[in-house]
Regions:
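Expand to "…catalyze enediolate/carbanion chemistry for C-C bond making/breaking, isomerization
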Residues: 28-292
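Bacterial N-terminal signal peptides that target proteins for export
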Residues: 1-10
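Residue-level signal for mature regions of secreted extracellular proteins and peptides
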Residues: 14-15
């Protein structure tokens, strides 16, 4: 898959040229990515058409722990947890899911952990905030600005429901002063991700995909399947979104596991997102499949 270009450092460029001559370009891309900063690491992989592998940041709160009144407690994310993830050489990115309950302290904690890890190739951090419709445009705008200010490498806007809402989502990054990586700005450093997760948005996917100024187009297959009424319909919708992301030259992300990661790679997904105890094994399978 051919994607828009990216600014390479002199060292990364030299390494890529040498590797190409030796017919080992995949290894060169990996090496360039691991010597870059977190956001540049993910951008360089995707600019080269190389799949990237990541995980949901795990909730560290002990299972069954509740508040004194018996109510459910929010997820817990710590700097120590972020530092531990940063030491995992398999990870290209982390996906911090704050869709259910936005928490600026969680963003700050994971960023602190990544910064304190001492790792030269710490993964990129993508933060998923709540949908625009849930708390309103101004709340969403403020969260994008805040997450980026705290050090996130990108922000994910879920449940984008129309072309108008897609343009609104992109405007949040402009208001943050973010240098967004996109087909019109291949030298950008921040990732802006839009997710299509309902039937209405799927019907408008072509116009949503054509929205300028964002980095990644993805489909929330679970949410879309529920909205459409079946897993089969959700899968068909996911493939339609993938086709449009490829048409406009953007990477597409999907959840995967050890059983389907090779299939998803063959289909053309460039962002593979794992979870749970089997995440590392699934990533090993995926990396082997693409020669990483």
């Amino acid at each position: 898959m051919t994607l828009f270009g990216v600014r390479w450092t002199a060292a990364a460029t030299a390494l890529y040229i040498i590797a190409a001559c030796a017919d080992v370009a995949d290894e060169a891309v990996d090496a360039a990515a691991t010597t870059a900063g977190p956001s540049a690491r993910l951008i360089q992989l995707w600019s080269a058409g190389t799949p990237a592998f990541g995980v949901f940041v795990p909730n560290e709160r002990p299972r069954g722990e509740v508040a004194p009144d018996g109510s459910r407690l929010p997820p817990l994310y710590t700097a120590q947890g972020g530092a531990s993830l940063a030491e995992n050489p398999l990870l290209d990115y982390l996906f911090l899911n704050l869709e259910g309950s936005y928490d600026a302290e969680a963003v700050a904690a994971i960023v602190e952990g990544l910064n304190q890890s001492g790792s030269d190739d710490a993964p990129s951090l993508l933060v998923r905030i709540s949908p625009i419709e849930r708390d309103g445009a101004e709340a969403a705008r403020g969260r994008v600005i805040e997450a980026l200010r705290l050090g996130a490498d990108g922000v994910v806007i879920p449940h984008v429901r129309s072309p108008e809402e897609a343009r609104l989502a992109v405007s949040f990054f402009a208001d943050a002063g973010a240098d967004v990586w996109s087909p019109d700005n291949p030298n950008g450093e921040i990732l802006a991700m839009i997710m299509i997760e309902d039937a209405g948005a799927l019907a408008a996917v072509s116009e949503i995909a054509d929205t300028p100024g964002y980095s990644v187009l993805a489909c929330g297959i679970g949410s879309l399947s529920r909205d459409l009424g079946s897993r089969e319909a959700g899968e068909a919708g996911t493939q339609e979104v993938l086709a449009h992301s490829e048409r406009v030259g953007l990477p597409n992300m999907i959840t995967a596991n050890a059983q389907d990661v090779e299939q998803r790679l063959e289909e053309g997904f460039l962002g593979l997102l794992m979870s749970g105890l089997g995440a590392d094994e699934a990533i090993r399978i995926g990396r082997f499949a693409v020669g990483r």
